[in-house]
UniProtKB/Swiss-Prot annotation:
Site (Important for substrate specificity): R12, T73, Q155
Catalytic residue list: D72 (proton acceptor)
The entry's keywords: Cytoplasm, Hydrolase, Nucleotide metabolism
Name recorded for this polypeptide: dTTP/UTP pyrophosphatase
Pfam families xrefs: Maf (PF02545)
Cytoplasm found in the keyword field: yes
Organism: Pseudomonas fluorescens (strain Pf0-1)
Database matches in SUPFAM superfamilies: ITPase-like
């Protein structure tokens, strides 16, 4: 059985991968996340997911066979990528832009072994209710939005802003479990392994 490495420091991605019963080792694979000139949001998230998987592969010292899973999520409003907020003003500005509107969340996953790399991009639409400036400031003060694309976490306190979701909840959190299980299956890594081991 191939060993799996998750090239991510995200605790949410670790939780989601654990949820589907796939044993893995998490590794940190930092790459430059600056968008390229004229790069579409879809191309951006796919490039970053592949880049993280490739960076992870360079870190791994295990003998083959193994696979590396990389992922990236972008919040997109009117074609513009909203990254992780740099400070309170940035986070509040993002939330005010998202307030009362529908936005797109793109999550890309990439799996590679020594021979090939396959990727998928999952698109979800999230609709926010109206948010007051006071709510945005209080949310920032909670600490939750600091490391989140678009300045919010759907799985935490930020859920109160979400009026609707069309797509994959787990993809908005950071790892689309259905597509991840399918893609890992193509590489001979089945889900529910930890259930069979008990």
């Amino acid at each position: 059985m191939k060993k799996l490495y998750l090239a991510s420091g995200s605790p949410r991605r670790r939780e989601l991968l654990t949820q589907i019963g796939i044993p893995f080792t998490a590794i940190s694979a930092d790459i430059d996340e600056t968008p390229l000139a004229n790069e579409s949001p879809l191309a951006y998230v796919e490039r970053l997911a592949r880049g993280k998987a490739e960076a992870g592969r360079r870190i791994v010292t295990s003998e083959p066979p193994f696979c590396v899973l990389g992922a990236d999520t972008a919040v997109v409003l009117d074609g513009k990528i909203l990254g992780k907020p740099v400070d309170e003003a940035d986070a509040c500005a993002m939330l005010m832009m998202l307030s009362g509107k529908e936005h797109e969340v793109l999550t890309a996953i990439a799996v590679l072994d020594g021979e090939r790399c396959e990727s998928r991009v999952v698109r979800s639409l999230v609709r926010f209710r109206s948010i007051s400036r006071e709510e945005a400031a209080a949310y920032w003060a909670s600490g939750e939005p600091r490391d989140k694309a678009g300045g919010y976490g759907i799985q935490g306190l930020g859920a109160v802003f979400v009026a609707g979701l069309n797509g994959s909840y787990s993809a908005v959190v950071g790892l689309p479990v259905c597509e991840s299980a399918e893609l890992l299956g193509h590489f001979g890594i089945p889900c529910w392994q930890t259930l069979n081991a008990q």
